[in-house]
Amino acid sequence: MNKDRVSLPALCFSLAFISLLSLAAQSQENVPPRSKNGSASEGKRDQVLPGPTTTPASPKTEEVRLAVDLVVLDAQVLQQKTGRAVGFMKKEDFVLSEDGVQQQITHFGQDSLPLSVLFLIDRGGCLDPFSEKVRHSILESARRLKPQDEVALMAFHNTTELVTRFTRNQDRIIDGLDHLPPHDEEANHCFNRAFYDAAEFMRRAGNPDGRRVIIVITSVTSYFDCSGPSGDDARRAILESGSVVCGIIPKSTGQRMESGIMRTITGIGGAFKVRSSNLNQLAEETGGEVLTDKPDNLDHTFNDLIGHLRTRYVVGFVSTNPKHDGSFRKLKLDVVPSLQKPDSKLIVKTRRGYIAGRRRTTT
């Protein structure tokens, strides 16, 4: 039997189990072990993001704060059976409600706004998801974007590093991919810190009125929260940044083993109230998707994801509830019943709600 095939799962399980014991002992404060060099390596072209600071505890209400009357949704329509994106729909093909009250769609379009895409690349854990095939797929997907779109690169494990700021220059993207921090198998997958810092960076996107997308490249979908902002704070930051979270997971035997172990261990940790962050849940909540495929097929997978982003619809409305009271408003966007066929049901993926921002007062 190949010793390497045995040692990798054993190492992953050992590290995960040790992490669980450490996190449970620390109660609510998780301090990850340091990497070999103490922190993420500094970027040579762009400054490293400052370490995140813990924000005040947030209410438990599901919320996204909007300070303007116009509410904008970024929605994707898929065939339920095949997962294929559906294009060429009209405003009249949708029905929108807020807190159960039907709303009038006043703004509508498809593929009309530029994209701001942040590739968030995992550099920690037992397996390195960033292979030469993944590098090639990222570069090819960036080349398929439109001239007005922009791309940025960020890496994470115990810390986050902004490798390349938003750019439309292909040479800068290539340079960034060639200078990612090295993989550190002793470091963690600190999703809470990565999501929080990514959200803060997305607020400074060059396309403030465009569509903001975070594409996570990783081998796992859940991990314990590390020190810094909680997973809840990171989630809130993502929602308030207006970003859609997607994921690409290069599939392999080792990856399935590591991801399965982490799902099990974080599930056990949850019983002890040890906090964790989950990529699948955040993608679902923001209207994104997580795609998994073998490295040899990733060109096609990335192409599918970019195609899905291109066929998303921009839906805007002004709420019939004029109050600016900070209340949570639940949204539901569907296609009209006449378009639903028994053998070809359509589903809509979009964010689930927002908070009506309070009017600012001056003294």
Where do the PLM segments sit?
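Scaffold/interface architecture of coatomer-like assemblies
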Residues: 25-363
